[in-house]
């Protein structure tokens, strides 16, 4: 809720809204500084990990910021849908979990 409200908690602003705008968008690309062709970048972007990194948040291929932990801890934020999905489970397939979140839950909103 705090992240969806961009720094407001119980009606009081605790963090600047700009921090969330910046932090939930790509601040760095994983391939920055490399001399890559458009084709090479397109191949890299087939991987969920290569869509940018904000402030402790990965940017997913669909543009949704996400927080990842080890073994199935994931939180995906869809501000345009007013939706936050948090999962804590045991899996070695974080990208499969992300795909399920996207196709089975987020797509319903």
Residue spans for each PLM region:
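Non-transmembrane alpha-helical segments in soluble domains
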Residues: 1, 20-24, 54-56, 102, ...
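Active-site-proximal binding-pocket segments
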Residues: 1-25
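Active-site-proximal alpha-helical segments within enzyme catalytic domains
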Residues: 1-8, 73-89
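Active-site Gly/Thr loop motif
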Residues: 24-84
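A short acidic/small-residue loop/turn micro-motif
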Residues: 91-93
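Short, gly/Ser/Thr-rich active-site loops of penicillin-recognizing serine hydrolases
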Residues: 95-109
